[in-house]
């Protein structure tokens, strides 16, 4: 049920905070990281029919993020952490979900973006030992995705060549050869089916610079798990807002609010005023 809305998740996290059995309640993230994770979940709901931002929905988004942030002490990660944004590094797509804190029992809740189907396998493998469950986080009843395009663009007027390029880009071979969740259905099914095969892969790691080593054994996915993942991916309908100017404004102002540097009303007014002015200029 916590995955049905940000408020339900915040309620659940505050309840879990009463049990002090783990170092943190939520996977440690900087304010910017929390704001971006939930921006990707909720921003699709903000734009009204007239093209302006809905102040009430922006206010609720900020309120729920701050509730989650305030549950834990973030002084360590804020002092040395770097803002980790879902994106590209050396040509490789990565997400913001880190299943290792649950595996090492240093937190009770983790969330973030899934970059490829192998992230599902890691998440399921990490949750095997403690019975953790996962769900698609949505707000307003519709789950969202973070669109990503990796392509070469050439100027010119060759329409046939352009069509052939797009066809190749969206084809099974291109989807299978790159990191990320492919839009090609055949490529996606092949990637999921591959994770049902036998695997003996393991990964050793430590946390927070300690000498203690952990080893996680990757396990094969079951048919039921594979079917569930495919159904979840196929059910995604809307993308998060993709305009970087809007995203940057929200994250910048939201960080000041989450850290207690300005109040909610000031933050909402600053975001809606600047974003609505920007949107009006784009029309």
Q: Where is each model-derived feature located?
A:
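Extracytoplasmic/periplasmic solute-binding protein
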Residues: 5-53, 57-59, 105
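Non-transmembrane alpha-helical segments in soluble domains
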Residues: 10-17, 36, 62-69, 162-171, ...
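Short helices/loops that flank or line small-molecule/ion binding pockets
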Residues: 11-15, 80-111, 115, 252, ...
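Glycine-centered hinge/linker elements that transmit conformational signals in sensory
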Residues: 13, 48-93
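Bilobed periplasmic-binding protein-like "clamshell/Venus-flytrap" ligand-binding domains
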Residues: 17-29, 174-185, 277-283
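A ligand-binding cleft/hinge motif common to bilobed small-molecule-binding domains
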Residues: 103, 112-129
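Extracytoplasmic/periplasmic substrate-recognition and gating elements
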Residues: 123-194
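Conserved C-terminal helix/tail region of periplasmic/extracytoplasmic solute-binding proteins
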Residues: 203-283
């Amino acid at each position: 049920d916590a995955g049905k809305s940000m408020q339900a998740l915040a309620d659940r996290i505050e309840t879990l905070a009463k049990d002090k059995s783990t170092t943190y309640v939520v996977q440690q993230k900087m304010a910017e990281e929390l704001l971006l994770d939930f921006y990707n979940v909720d921003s699709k709901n903000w734009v009204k029919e007239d093209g302006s931002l809905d102040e009430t929905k922006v206010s609720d988004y900020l309120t729920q993020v701050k509730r989650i942030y305030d549950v834990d002490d973030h002084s360590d990660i804020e002092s040395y952490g770097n803002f980790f944004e879902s994106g590209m590094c050396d040509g490789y797509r990565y997400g913001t979900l880190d299943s290792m804190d649950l595996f090492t029992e240093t937190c009770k809740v983790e969330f973030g973006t899934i970059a490829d189907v192998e992230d599902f396998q890691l998440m399921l493998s990490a949750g095997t030992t403690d019975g953790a469950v996962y769900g698609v986080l949505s707000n307003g009843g519709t789950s969202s995705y973070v669109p990503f395009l990796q392509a070469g663009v050439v100027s010119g007027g060759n329409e046939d060549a352009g069509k052939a390029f797009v066809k190749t880009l969206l084809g099974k071979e291109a989807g299978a050869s790159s990191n990320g969740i492919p839009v090609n259905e055949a490529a996606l099914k092949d990637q999921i089916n591959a994770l049902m095969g036998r695997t003996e892969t393991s990964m050793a790691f430590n946390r927070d610079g300690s000498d203690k080593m952990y080893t996680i054994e990757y396990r094969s996915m079951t048919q039921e798990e594979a079917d569930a993942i495919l159904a979840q991916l196929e059910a995604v309908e809307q993308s998060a807002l993709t305009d970087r100017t809007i995203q940057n404004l929200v994250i910048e102002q939201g960080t000041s609010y989450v850290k207690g540097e300005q109040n909610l009303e000031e933050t909402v007014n600053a975001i809606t005023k600047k974003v609505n002015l920007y949107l009006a200029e784009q029309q």
